[in-house]
């Protein structure tokens, strides 16, 4: 499939979209999604814990297993969670596993894109492979009349690729490629997320985001003389909270505080909860036996699912 028509279509869509008033608010803030849509009510059931520990889809799979099958598969998971292979699962290892389970869609996306970029099959995606697969012959035939600078886009991608390339060999392994495609998920990539956001919003090129640039990124008032209430609220937010040093503009640190807030760490809280509830000898870490013994806290099975079905039936 040729890339040029796709890229041109994208460019035209963006130009068309930018010419229409934007009523709905654009949100650049990166928030962690909740671990589960269920209420965390362990006195009634462990549905929240199951979805937090496994992810929603995998939790449903466990609900169809017998208790014996559920325990066996849980035991296999424990061996993966115990990264340092010391025979224990620490709070930190549990936290990392929960985060991994919650972000499984990201890894699925990376796997899908990986197949289209690792052309030589060496298990790495080089910068050249990515650039050629993404931009193709646009490199040789840029069209400046469409208002887009593809060379500028390539330069921006290359900068992000190099930031994700921790060993600086211009070849990305799976983890580095994940950081490149989803930089907001990695601490060492957060500065590039901030920089790219500022470049998008900073129209006068002074390296800051002023009030009008901030509002202009969220709302296009063309053809609409009156501002929605949320726009007036955002003006107040900028003045009272975003611009912390009160100089009328946001610098890099203020922008970072805005788009990458320090949210409550749900994964860490759940990891501590699971360890506390299962830690029989209270040494602050879990053995495989301790986890499997409390298997119904971590995973479901036909037995727990049937029990909850009976409980729901009794309510009626």
From Swiss-Prot:
Glycosylation sites: 132
Chain positions recorded as Ca(2+) 2 binding sites: 118, 120, 122, 129
Subcellular location(s) per record: Endoplasmic reticulum membrane; Golgi apparatus; Secreted; Melanosome
Organism, as annotated: Salmo salar (Atlantic salmon)
Domain EF-hand stretches: 69-104, 105-140, 152-187, 189-224, 230-265, 266-301
Residues the entry annotates as binding Ca(2+) 1: 82, 84, 86, 88, 93
Record GO cellular component, one term: endoplasmic reticulum membrane
Residues that hold Ca(2+) 6 according to the record: 279, 281, 283, 285, 290
Family indicated by similarity: Belongs to the CREC family.
Protein name in UniProt: Calumenin-B
Phylogenetic lineage: Eukaryota, Metazoa, Chordata, Craniata, Vertebrata
Gene coding for it: calub
GO-annotated molecular function: calcium ion binding
């Amino acid at each position: 499939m040729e890339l040029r028509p796709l890229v041109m279509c994208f460019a035209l869509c963006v130009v068309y979209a930018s010419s229409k008033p934007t009523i709905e608010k654009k949100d650049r803030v990166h928030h962690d999604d909740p671990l589960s849509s269920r209420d965390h009510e362990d006195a009634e059931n462990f549905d929240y814990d199951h979805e937090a520990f496994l992810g929603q889809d995998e939790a449903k799979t466990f609900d169809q297993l017998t208790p014996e099958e559920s325990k066996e598969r849980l035991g296999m998971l424990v061996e993966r969670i115990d990264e340092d292979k010391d025979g224990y699962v620490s709070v930190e290892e549990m936290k990392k596993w929960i985060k991994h389970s919650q972000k499984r869609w990201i890894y699925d996306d990376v796997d899908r894109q990986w197949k289209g970029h690792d052309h030589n099959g060496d298990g790495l995606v080089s910068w050249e492979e990515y650039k050629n697969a993404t931009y193709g012959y646009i490199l040789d035939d840029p069209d400046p009349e469409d208002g887009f600078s593809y060379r500028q886009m390539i330069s921006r991608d290359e900068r992000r690729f190099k930031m994700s390339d921790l060993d600086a060999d211009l070849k990305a392994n799976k983890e580095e490629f994940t950081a490149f495609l989803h930089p907001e998920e990695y601490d060492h990539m957060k500065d590039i997320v901030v920089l790219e956001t500022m470049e998008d919003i900073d129209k006068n090129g002074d390296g800051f985001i002023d009030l009008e640039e901030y509002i202009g990124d969220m709302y296009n008032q063309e053809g609409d003389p009156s501002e929605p209430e949320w726009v007036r609220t955002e003006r107040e937010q900028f003045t009272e909270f975003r611009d912390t040093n009160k100089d009328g503009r946001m610098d890099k640190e203020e922008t970072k505080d805005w788009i990458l807030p320090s949210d409550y760490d749900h994964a860490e809280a759940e990891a501590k909860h699971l360890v506390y509830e299962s830690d029989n000898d209270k040494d602050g870490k879990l053995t495989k036996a301790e986890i499997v013994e409390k298997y119904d806290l971590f995973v479901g099975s036909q037995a727990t699912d049937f029990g909850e079905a009976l409980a729901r039936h009794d309510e009626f």
